Every structure is written in structure tokens, then in C-alpha cells.
């Protein structure tokens, strides 16, 4: 009896999503990138890279940027449909009473740890981090901000917190910051599809609606396929 040869799944392309946990426009983009991840799950692998938007040896209090956010958050809501929570906005409108000192490093380390447990759920975890900050008003520089997410994703607490404070994982987060710079990303959110070698197709720069991102992805994949046919 003759058997049919096993069908191998086509190789997936890599979409790199550059974001920062403290980027309000990335928070607004979260529903878009989550929808993209689901719609293209058979065609794309997605790698989320933290960009290190707010980094300083001595982090500044939220008051330094509060007046800007007081206006900017409304623009993000109007354009994206996302909502910022009252617990987050309390810190923005009461900066003199807030104990927040935003810094991108700890949430970047947290994402780096998470990717080792659930590499296929990077987009969801990044979105959950931003929801914890921007809606629930959790301080991402505080270890306790991550505890509920550890329960949600069933990540061992001791393992997570050991890594969160380790030099090794800090260096891994710093490597991601450097990689984002190497990709010449100058703002967030940014999404790129890797073609061959060091060639990339930009599919989102700044907040971009789903239809536009989807069209850009389709065009990029067609161009990559066409280039492969020409070179073969």
C-alpha cells in the first residue's frame, strides 16, 4: 500500500514588535498586535523586544512627564479606542502625591523572563503588562506589580523573582535595548518583518490600525515570496 509523503508546514517568517512597557501608544496598539498575532499565527512568529524608552541611573518622578500625559492620554484614547484606568490617572493628575519613578528596565527584564516560559505568548504578556500599568495603575518598578501575572500564567514565583534581580537577566534586557537601536527603531510601537539576512520590511511605525498593518504584512510577505522565487 502506497503512503503519501508527510506534508511539512511552510516556514514562518519573523515579525519583530518593538515596544516599551511605558509607551502609551504601544498600550493603544495592544489590541491591534494581539489581533495580528492571532490572524497570522500560521504565517508569522512574533518576537517582542523592549526598547528601553525610559532609562536613567537616577529615575525621575512621574511629575516630570505628568503634564504631557494629562493631554496625551486623551489623544491615545480618541485614536485607538483604548481606555486608561482611574488608578493610573490618579498618579498623572496627582503627581505630587505619587510615589512613581518610571523606569523601563524592570518590565523589560520581566518580559525577557516570561519569553523563556511561554515564547508563543509574548504579545499577550506585553499587553498584560501595559494593562497592569495603564488601567490597573500598578507600578512596574515594584515587584508586587507582577505577582498577579505570575499566577495568571502559572510561573513559579521564586524562579521569577530570582531572575528579576539577577545580573544575567538585566544584561539580557540591555541586549534587547541594544538590538532595538541596531534595528534603527526611533519610536514605539514599531513592527518589522525580517526578510533575508539584515533586510526588514516596516509594517507599522507609530500607532497603526489593524487594516493598515494587515495590508502591509500581506504586501511584505508577497514581496519576500517574489524575491525568493527570483533568486531560486
What is each PLM-predicted segment?
Residues 10-16:
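Extreme N-terminal starter segment of soluble prokaryotic enzymes
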